[in-house]
């Protein structure tokens, strides 16, 4: 969105002439592809691998300097052309203007009073860059032959963007010319800036994003140079790493899912004008109207003339914002830290615990989240920890007898403990685990706060330090919360307080004709609030009834900018890992839906 550009926007119109030969770059990219396709490094070796990959990438960037396609002037010089183009093609352009909000970057400012829930912005399909428009473009022949482009719409969209940027007469030039020339995603971080993220929970995703992007570039460089269907692509003679990083970041920070024209499925899209809106806390207020075939956005709240118009991107953590959007949101009520937990197969009760978890729809090993808000754990994590800490007798109670299914229903409900002893154990475990994670950081909370007072820090360095500080603060709160809960349940146990009795009327159950197939609503989607679908995530802005009528892609946890659930992310990454093992042509865009 507008916030992504804090740097000078280079513009010129054509690529410069470089002396480096395609064969020389081909040799370097082959080396890069081999390095990026090697097995994952062992514990403690990720940084070393990152530096090695980065060294190769920088060598390629240096040799390609001057080859990239750029434009003349500043980004904002093209805003009038964008508004004119949008207006001529049926988009709304009244009631707002594009303005530089300094720290937040460019955004939309109201030029009149706008009421909450008022429809103020709409963008018809013809203005959107989509996977479908990519298929029908000069990229089409290569798309029809390359299985990576076919399988990963985000990569297809990135190449679509590159091809159109290199085509002076492209229909989308008025839009493309207003995109930032650089972003603040970790793909653009200097090595010293990435170093600030060492020991954080987010660093693994940063490494993965960088490695996957480098691997994709190396693979596609060879495709562009050797595939017969790539001969007519306008980027054939100037496909640089810098170009690919830019395209990937443009897509990563902006893409969303919209319905196809017949409404039968979804497709990825870039949405001009709308993608200038910056983020604030709130609710999803963007939808897709199939009847009018356009993206629509209603006001999140009342906006007076002269105020910035915000939208809600969704329930993203700050790690997701930094890695995928290139900014840190200071007042993020949805911030959280990933925590990997699993039942050891060496546990003598493993089989029983695995069965109880399976009945609750929870895997024996997964990535959960510790939340900034109270309570620090979700119903899914509570259920997992309860099973993790169960005795053999408690496990039997959840597996055998007429009341077993009822006990499964209560696993994620804090009002119905398995036992006081079980609660003491799980909160003790969580306290210890969060404490151990805190000790892995190389700096303290106080030291981070002190460093942030240094005005010489770059914007990206500040983001990195804020991110690691935020992680520590969440972990510290989790430790304190766990300690309070531990003592409360210990007191209940010492006083031999009676356990609350479960009654079916206490919980909402999913309707089903087969009793044993019912699952408690609270456990149905693992860590549902930890992330959301990679979709245009559009909640009905006015009413659910109208949403159904208009054919909007809805979802309470859906958000703009291509976020997805942690479970979905893990599943997709697993599939990608399998594909990567098959050969160099299997590649992915980590975090660039993503």
UniProtKB/Swiss-Prot annotation:
| Ranges where the SET domain occurs | 94-314
List keywords of the entry alphabetically: Actin-binding, Cytoplasm, Methyltransferase, Nucleus, Phosphoprotein, S-adenosyl-L-methionine, Transferase, Ubl conjugation
Processing after translation:
Phosphorylated by GSK3B, which is required for recognition by the SCF(FBXW7) complex and subsequent degradation. Ubiquitinated by the SCF(FBXW7) complex following phosphorylation by GSK3B, leading to its degradation by the proteasome.
Modification sites for Phosphoserine? 513
Key word Transcription regulation present in the record?
no
Q: What is its EC number?
A: 2.1.1.85
Residue stretches of biased makeup (Polar residues) = 10-20, 555-572, 583-594
Q: What is the effect of changing residue 256 to F?
A: Shows protein-lysine methyltransferase activity toward an actin mutant with a Lys instead of a His target residue
The Gene Ontology biological process terms listed for this entry are:
actin modification; peptidyl-histidine methylation; positive regulation of DNA-templated transcription; positive regulation of muscle cell differentiation; positive regulation of transcription by RNA polymerase II; regulation of uterine smooth muscle contraction
A GO-annotated cellular component: nucleoplasm
Q: What segments bear the compositional bias annotation Basic and acidic residues?
A: 573-582
What compartments host this protein? Cytoplasm; Nucleus
Name a Pfam family for this protein.
Rubis-subs-bind
> Domain of life of the organism in this record?
Eukaryota
Select a single GO molecular function from the record's annotations and give it.
histone H3K36 methyltransferase activity
Residue positions annotated to bind S-adenosyl-L-methionine are: 75, 104-106, 254, 275-279, 325-327
* Complex formation: Interacts with MYOD1.
Its biological purpose: Protein-histidine N-methyltransferase that specifically mediates 3-methylhistidine (tele-methylhistidine) methylation of actin at 'His-73'. Histidine methylation of actin is required for smooth muscle contraction of the laboring uterus during delivery. Does not have protein-lysine N-methyltransferase activity and probably only catalyzes histidine methylation of actin.
- Cite any additional comment in the entry: Shows protein-methionine methyltransferase activity in vitro on an actin mutant with a Met instead of a His residue at position 73.
Please state what the annotation says regarding this protein's domains. The SET domain specifically recognizes and binds actin, suggesting that it does not accommodate substrates diverging from actin.
Record's protein name: Actin-histidine N-methyltransferase
Give the source species: Homo sapiens (Human)
